[in-house]
Amino acid sequence: MHPPEATTKMSSVRFMVTPTKIDDIPGLSDTSPDLSSRSSSRVRFSSRESVPETSRSEPMSELSGATTSLATVALDPSSDRTSNPQDVTEDPSQNSITGEHSQLLDDGHKKARNAYLNNSNYEEGDEYFDKNLALFEEEMDTRPKVSSLLNRMANYTNLTQGAKEHEEAENITEGKKKPTKSPQMGTFMGVYLPCLQNIFGVILFLRLTWVVGTAGILQAFAIVLICCCCTMLTAISMSAIATNGVVPAGGSYFMISRALGPEFGGAVGLCFYLGTTFAAAMYILGAIEIFLVYIVPRAAIFRSDDALKESAAMLNNMRVYGTAFLVLMVLVVFIGVRYVNKFASLFLACVIVSILAIYAGAIKSSFAPPHFPVCMLGNRTLSSRHLDICSKTKEVDNMTVPSKLWGFFCNSSQFFNATCDEYFVHNNVISIQGIPGLASGIITENLWSNYLPKGEIIEKPSAKSSDVLGNLNHEYVLADITTSFTLLVGIFFPSVTGIMAGSNRSGDLKDAQKSIPIGTILAILTTSFVYLSNVVLFGACIEGVVLRDKFGDAVKGNLVVGTLSWPSPWVIVIGSFFSTCGAGLQSLTGAPRLLQAIAKDNIIPFLRVFGHSKANGEPTWALLLTAAIAELGILIASLDLVAPILSMFFLMCYLFVNLACALQTLLRTPNWRPRFRYYHWALSFMGMSICLALMFISSWYYAIVAMVIAGMIYKYIEYQGAEKEWGDGIRGLSLSAARFALLRLEEGPPHTKNWRPQLLVLLKLDEDLHVKHPRLLTFASQLKAGKGLTIVGSVIVGNFLENYGDALAAEQTIKHLMEAEKVKGFCQLVVAAKLKEGISHLIQSCGLGGMKHNTVVMGWPNGWRQSEDARAWKTFIGTVRVTTAAHLALLVAKNVSFFPSNVEQFSEGNIDVWWIVHDGGMLMLLPFLLKQHKVWRKCSIRIFTVAQLEDNSIQMKKDLATFLYHLRIEAEVEVVEMHDSDISAYTYERTLMMEQRSQMLRHMRLSKTERDREAQLVKDRNSMLRLTSIGSDEDEETETYQEKVHMTWTKDKYMASRGQKVKSMEGFQDLLNMRPDQSNVRRMHTAVKLNEVIVNKSHEAKLVLLNMPGPPRNPEGDENYMEFLEVLTEGLERVLLVRGGGSEVITIYS
């Protein structure tokens, strides 16, 4: 409590807190809180001798961000006052005067009674007051307490695409609102399994064996490894992008478009959409191939006995059945998309069972290989679909008669007088084991490639029979297409796509930033292992001619991979059929929603119609367009021709994902803070290079077409072309590029994600034109991890015509210092008659177009208390007011000479952030930027916030930790409780001393003695040039003072001066009897209490960042404002006072 000496001056000074719930606290949006409509709170003054301890110790509310308290302040500075609360308001001079209700004095200027608002007669609608945060109360409407925001900032809602429409439709039909379920899916169910289902597909079952047989084990292993490396590098880049903020529902398109902008985002989004649509066509074609070739071959509508026409007939069958399947699947998606999602797990189970059957069969083949004989004529493979026996003759009733094979190669069914094929005559028909098994050593024969032209007979590579041509009408197994390494790359690549399935479900994930990287990378590792191991197993277990037999003609029409599986080939056939059907349904479900998301962004006007949906959110028009494009893929009818098209679009998409990550990393934008740490721009660049190489390796003409399509979309969206203004060589090119870039920059404020500190550093110069505080420039260089603009400015007071040379010299001095401190930026000096005007001109006019500063950096005016000249601190406060009016952020470095140089490096320590009021998030962003510099890199960030009596400090700490997690900022969190609201004697006396000093200086300035008159006259006449620094330059007071000095001395003026001295002595006598103003006591109480807790927690911190209170609305309180700031920062070595510009500079979203 109060010491005895304090009681002689005051009876009792206490705060009485009466908590009251405010019902109209404004709601806050997830991205940018609405800070403009905060309701005000009521304050009244009363007198009480005692307040029960329970009124200060009991927690009043546990609702963070939803309720706040209304403070009822009891303040009785004099013991002779009456206890009636109305006594406080009886004096007319104590009426509240705000900016809108100011009294107009005789001089025509608005003037309030106190420096700050003193609202003792409260009316509804006035400003917000808080017992412990009185210093910040004037701006509580625009800079609210942290405790009132944390709950809304930490808890955001993530709706999936169409979920809002679904919910609204259900509410309309059911007549009541159902609570929205929060996302609960984890890494395994939400990312890992969907990625497995989308990566494993038709290529694994229908084409991988053929790829191994054609390319050989070594080249096939290389193809699979390159494709898997491409997707792994892309997944790393995607993980960095996905963990750079809260991923909205919408997945990959939103990640790419928000990372690269609307032009690239629209182009890549459409490429991704077309890829997904053609994937649906590919899966449908795969399902039809399994159905017609392996399950029900008799269902074929078109048939041909001619080997050359058989493939054409098969393509027509694929078109008919494919169209029918597409219509059926579109109806399923249109009517019941929920059933598609419900059966997804069943389709995934089919895939997993099929893969396990392959491994089981490979293991079993090592000791008991399955019996699948292959009929060979010499080295040539025969189709066993129409053979009754693998022999030229057969025994019937003890008689040797020609077999069906004889009839295929001879023109007569009789042994005599038959003319047979020459190769048939000279070679024997033998039967070999199609699956020799793992221990057979067949792996050595399958190591090397065996590429064939179209129509070539498949035969053993050891002894080719190229000397005798075969008749294509015979029952040979033929190559249906011309094969090459590049073709196989294009065909196989779709089997590794699908890595974005997890990010597409981002809205359903409980913690997307954790689940997407882990689940995606684990899924790629799993699928890569399966593919690579299957390449080796297929080559080690299956005969080469069987591997190259794409449709299983040599093994009686069985699926080749099915012949290896255990317990039955039908496990693979049925499993692969259902898995391809499921994958097709998933593609037809996802592609329309992707198109709908692109259309809703309204970046491509002619797609706007596809953004409309049914009442339940289903994109009907987008589904119809998707079906039409998929039909084009089905009309192609060949899986081997559709796969390279699909590869192009996915490779284009992956290329831009890697490009986005590489650009963000190299540009080092402040918003680029991925929680996933294992990325590097070199990995992204390597992934981008592999994607580009694969595009041209697989099909160079398809690659060019895909790029042209993407380029046309980019051009359509925004690109208008740069003017060819070359000038004189490289400099002309640089000027043209700079002009083009400046014109492209937005004139308006940038998006929160793109905000970076563009600094205007105000430096002080001494009489020799040297920088007084070079460490301020050092600090600015350490902040430039944001890679923004830096302008170094200073003001020389004088006449421009006379001081132009000095300005050039000072500019060169500053440039040399900038070079020494490695600050890349521009220097701007202004010669002005008055310092305030010069600073105002700098703040208003620096920069060009979109490259304008948004943050002002300046030093604290040290020694302002000791200076007789008030211009030092008046210039400082004027600068604060100008930056506030310009909506710029302000950084004030106190004790800047103690700040570290670029050579010093802290090996440990803390950067402490005291987040008291929210003003845009600058306090969160600055320590992150500082930690990017080597000087501060090893420091840890600690964030403190203040809890009042009514706040739930435990919930505040949880909310703050959650908010920082979403911001991707690693920091230690602590909530400091400030429950004690007693005003101490020290606070009271400190306020009294402050007010006495201000009053005394005011009297001294009004009654200057004449002993300085002659000295001042000589000094003014002899000073030809006076260069003053920011903080101690000419002001309007200069003219007034000089008028006093140069006045003519008369008897009347002497008598007037003598009377003024007597009046001045009476004023000094009044100082001894004055009592401190109540509002100043409360503000001093805030400064003292905050300083106590800050010094207690942060006295050893390497740097303390603190909210800077705004200057008083009434200029009469400027000196008190400086005193409050001094008290607030006493006892701290390095302090950075931060004042936001009023706009959000940091966001949790990507």
Swiss-Prot record:
Cytoplasmic face residues: 1-135, 189-211, 455-464, 546-568, 613-629, 666-1150
Pfam families, sorted: AA_permease, SLC12
Modulation of this protein's activity: Inhibited following phosphorylation by OXSR1/OSR1 and STK39/SPAK: phosphorylation takes place downstream of WNK kinases (WNK1, WNK2, WNK3 or WNK4) in response to hyperosmotic stress and subsequent cell shrinkage.
Membrane topology: Multi-pass membrane protein
Region: Disordered, residue numbers: 1-108, 161-181
Outcome after substituting residue 991 to A: Constitutively enhanced potassium-chloride cotransport activity. Significant locomotor deficits
Sites where a glycan is attached: 379, 398, 411, 417
Keywords: Cell membrane, Chloride, Disulfide bond, Glycoprotein, Ion transport, Membrane, Metal-binding, Phosphoprotein, Potassium, Potassium transport, Symport, Transmembrane, Transmembrane helix, Transport
Region (Scissor helix): 682-691
Transmembrane segments: 136-158, 166-188, 212-245, 264-287, 288-316, 434-454, 465-487, 519-545, 569-589, 590-612, 630-649, 650-665
Localisation per UniProt entry: Cell membrane; Basolateral cell membrane
Modified residues (Phosphotyrosine): 1121
Binding site for chloride 2: 151, 443-444, 654
Disulfide bonds: 375-390, 410-420
Record annotation: effect of changing residue 679 to C: Reduced potassium-chloride cotransport activity in Xenopus laevis oocytes
Catalytic reaction equation(s): K(+)(in) + chloride(in) = K(+)(out) + chloride(out)
PTM (free text): Phosphorylated, phosphorylation regulates transporter activity. Phosphorylated at Thr-991 and Thr-1048 by OXSR1/OSR1 and STK39/SPAK downstream of WNK kinases (WNK1, WNK2, WNK3 or WNK4), inhibiting the potassium-chloride cotransport activity. N-glycosylated.
Composition skew (Polar residues), residue ranges: 80-101
Sequence positions that bind chloride 1: 447-448, 603, 654
PANTHER family, per database record: SOLUTE CARRIER FAMILY 12 MEMBER 6, SOLUTE CARRIER FAMILY 12, CATION COTRANSPORTERS
Oligomer status and interactors: Homodimer; adopts a domain-swap conformation at the scissor helices connecting the transmembrane domain and C-terminal domain. Heterodimer with K-Cl cotransporter SLC12A5. Interacts (via C-terminus) with CKB; the interaction may be required for potassium-chloride cotransport activity.
UniProt family annotation: Belongs to the SLC12A transporter family. K/Cl co-transporter subfamily.
Protein name: Solute carrier family 12 member 6
Organism (species): Mus musculus (Mouse)
